[in-house]
Amino acid sequence: MTTRERCQKAMEYHEKGLNCGQSVLAAFTDITGFTEEQSMALASGFGGGMRCGGVCGVISACVVVLGMAYPSTLENGPEGKKRSTQLVKEFQSRFLQRFHQLNCHELLAESDIEGTSIARELGVTHHCRLMVVSGVEMLCGMLEELEAL
């Protein structure tokens, strides 16, 4: 699946009423191994910054995808944990660089949010949908760099 197709899929999930985290996680079932339903169930509380304005559900879902692609387990010990930490910090850094915030409450207050190139190509204007599509595009770029896609 191309990055654009994955972004389109996440956007369609969001348009159908899924929250931001559900929309992102369900677009990566081929990487996580979760079914659509499992993805939706797992991320059902991610929307609205875990329903309290905290960390954006897009980020939470992307962290789950990274964890499934590059897990930290008892088997891989401290090295797995170190890699997991580095990947999460790298994704957060990229998100912060683009949107200047990590928390839903602050992201929703921003009036000059500009999406990534695919978000612009798809004509996304809905605030949270911009986060969904842009987050998927950023994660795909990161996974491609890591050769997981």
PLM features per residue range, with description:
Residues 31-41, 68-87:
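Phosphate-handling active-site elements
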Residues 20, 56, 104:
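Short cysteine clusters
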Residues 16-22:
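Short acidic alpha-helix initiation/capping motifs at coil-to-helix transition points
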Residues 1, 25-44, 105-111:
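Acidic-glycine-rich active-site phosphate/pyrophosphate-binding loop
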Residues 84-149:
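C-terminal binding/interaction regions
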Residues 1-14:
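Polybasic, low-complexity association/targeting segments
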Residues 45-53:
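Transmembrane alpha-helix interface/packing and boundary motifs in multi-pass membrane proteins
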Residues 61-69:
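DPxDG-like acidic metal-binding loop motif
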